[in-house]
Amino acid sequence: MENLNMDLLYMAAAIMMGLAAIGAAIGIGILGGKFLEGAARQPDLIPLLRTQFFIVMGLVDAIPMIAVGLGLYVMFAVA
């Protein structure tokens, strides 16, 4: 029974890290596409768009980093 609980914790951590990475990849792809679309429409706003792009990209990229930290915590501290 103890091995089953350990296996479930490892699977939960792996699923958490994998889904966070997939979600971030999709989010960054959509964000990059919208940035290029906005830059193509109004080239004079590129500096403003670039600033907002990098701020939002950092926020989107922070979620998988937090999930990796939580997943490693679950794998090594809880298990």
UniProtKB/Swiss-Prot annotation:
GO molecular function list: lipid binding; proton-transporting ATP synthase activity, rotational mechanism
Matching Pfam families: ATP-synt_C (PF00137)
GO CC annotation: plasma membrane; proton-transporting ATP synthase complex; proton-transporting two-sector ATPase complex, proton-transporting domain
Topology versus the membrane: Multi-pass membrane protein
TM helices/strands, residue ranges: 11-31, 53-73
InterPro entries: ATP_synth_csu_bac/chlpt, ATP_synth_F0_csu, ATP_synth_F0_csu_DDCD_BS, ATP_synth_F0_csu_sf, ATPase_proteolipid_c-like_dom, F/V-ATP_Csub_sf
SUPFAM superfamilies recorded: F1F0 ATP synthase subunit C (SSF81333)
Swiss-Prot/TrEMBL site (Reversibly protonated during proton transport) positions: 61
Primary site of residence: membrane
Family matches, as PROSITE patterns: ATPASE_C
Its biological purpose: F(1)F(0) ATP synthase produces ATP from ADP in the presence of a proton or sodium gradient. F-type ATPases consist of two structural domains, F(1) containing the extramembraneous catalytic core and F(0) containing the membrane proton channel, linked together by a central stalk and a peripheral stalk. During catalysis, ATP synthesis in the catalytic domain of F(1) is coupled via a rotary mechanism of the central stalk subunits to proton translocation.
Assembly description: F-type ATPases have 2 components, F(1) - the catalytic core - and F(0) - the membrane proton channel. F(1) has five subunits: alpha(3), beta(3), gamma(1), delta(1), epsilon(1). F(0) has three main subunits: a(1), b(2) and c(10-14). The alpha and beta chains form an alternating ring which encloses part of the gamma chain. F(1) is attached to F(0) by a central stalk formed by the gamma and epsilon chains, while a peripheral stalk is formed by the delta and b chains.
Protein name in the entry: ATP synthase subunit c
Species name: Yersinia enterocolitica serotype O:8 / biotype 1B (strain NCTC 13174 / 8081)
